[in-house]
Amino acid sequence: MTTIGTPLRPNATKVMMLGSGELGKEVVIELQRLGVEVIAVDRYENAPAQQVAHRAYTISMLDGAALRALAEKEKPDFIVPEVEAIATATLVELEQEGYNVVPTAKATQLTMNREGIRRLAAEELGLKTSPYRFVDNLEDFKQAVAEIGIPCVVKPIMSSSGHGQSVIKSEDQIQQAWDYSQEGGRAGGGRVIVEGFIKFDYEITQLTVRHVNGTSFLAPIGHRQEDGDYRESWQPQAMSDLALKRAQETAERITTALGGRGIFGVELFVCGDEIIFNEVSPRPHDTGMVTMASQELSQFALHARAILGLPISEIYQISPAASKAIVVEGKSNNMTFGNLDKVLEEIGTNIRLFGKGEVNGHRRLGVILARDENTEKALAKAERAYAKLAVQL
């Protein structure tokens, strides 16, 4: 029998979130709806999830000693990583000592860098991927580009939201791509992956939730990216029965290998009926924000249930829906979001503003959500709402 205590009391069920971005914020809210006490941790103060948690701490999560000290102080029932830049060796130690790391310390360690998960997928599980090379210096990088061929994709082995990622389309871009990769890694410069460019029909996120009753699949999510970062997503993505079956099989194989309970964002390329594995995140996925409009239980609510060992009997889709990221460019720590009466005037339209305190360059500050009778109309509705938004820096 699963039980939950009372927040801020000795019997509280406690979750410590490592990373407090907009995805973590929604997980915190869902956990609190279930009576869980939440501690939010990030490298900067007043991160989105910290704003809604019971307590917040600001540390470098790459500092294993600081991470251990915090775990020993709070003694959480669950440690839930939300970002890649974490001292995963410390998480492995804590798990061995009896702490419950979600989904597992192994999953967090393997997926924190692209090398671990690519070698698991391609070399151990035999999943189809793009051709790839891992390199540590400019000389080997140039050789890898020559072997893989142009065009090719370059990514730091540890980064997110497109940071440090680029596509080499001509030889004169090789040096620039290397330099950019060294600036964009979560842990600084260093090792990168060079991948062959896949000519796919479309790409999907196959959200997969491992829970006390087994493994369940959400309807596939289509999405569009710019510079490696999500801009729009929609659910469901139309695909053939065979392609969907293969996508779910691929997702089940990789998530089973990672183990544990929780939601996984499995990124796949689709070429006709063929499925090519790209990446997996052992946590909610940015493209999955659309589920806040499309499903009875969003990816965040499903993650919370899975973490706590609560049953997930059915994943019910309310409506086709779409999301559009609110990406702002500039420099400010005092943003204003205006014209909201116009943004929300159409039925089935909603907005989430993340509460981020500043922007310096490009930053995702919110998301538009829209429902309609099909995904094309939902996306058009989201785009109309987005066009009406006035952001003042």
Swiss-Prot record:
Example of a GO biological process term: 'de novo' IMP biosynthetic process
Keywords: ATP-binding, Ligase, Magnesium, Metal-binding, Nucleotide-binding, Purine biosynthesis
Stored InterPro entries: ATP-grasp, ATP-grasp_carboxylate-amine, ATP_grasp_subdomain_1, PreATP-grasp_dom_sf, PurT, PurT/PurK_preATP-grasp, PurT_C
Top-level enzyme category: ligase
Residues covered by the ATP-grasp domain: 119-308
Positions with a binding annotation for ATP: R114, K155, S160, S161, G162, H163, G164, Q165, E195, G196, F197, I198, E203
Signal peptide: none
One Gene Ontology term of the molecular function aspect: phosphoribosylglycinamide formyltransferase activity
Positions contributing to N(1)-(5-phospho-beta-D-ribosyl)glycinamide binding: E22, L23, E82, D286, K356, R363, R364
Binding-site residues for Mg(2+), renumbered to this chain: E267, E279
Any Gene Ontology CC annotation: cytosol
EC number of the protein: 6.3.1.21
PROSITE patterns to which the protein is assigned, alphabetical: ATP_GRASP
Catalytic function, reaction form: N(1)-(5-phospho-beta-D-ribosyl)glycinamide + formate + ATP = N(2)-formyl-N(1)-(5-phospho-beta-D-ribosyl)glycinamide + ADP + phosphate + H(+)
Associated pathway: Purine metabolism; IMP biosynthesis via de novo pathway; N(2)-formyl-N(1)-(5-phospho-D-ribosyl)glycinamide from N(1)-(5-phospho-D-ribosyl)glycinamide (formate route): step 1/1
Family to which the UniProt record says this protein belongs: Belongs to the PurK/PurT family.
Subunit structure: Homodimer.
Summary of the function given for this chain in its UniProt record: Involved in the de novo purine biosynthesis. Catalyzes the transfer of formate to 5-phospho-ribosyl-glycinamide (GAR), producing 5-phospho-ribosyl-N-formylglycinamide (FGAR). Formate is provided by PurU via hydrolysis of 10-formyl-tetrahydrofolate.
Family matches, as PANTHER family: FORMATE-DEPENDENT PHOSPHORIBOSYLGLYCINAMIDE FORMYLTRANSFERASE (PTHR43055:SF1)
Name this protein carries in UniProt: Formate-dependent phosphoribosylglycinamide formyltransferase
Highest classification ranks of the organism: Bacteria, Pseudomonadati, Pseudomonadota, Gammaproteobacteria, Pasteurellales
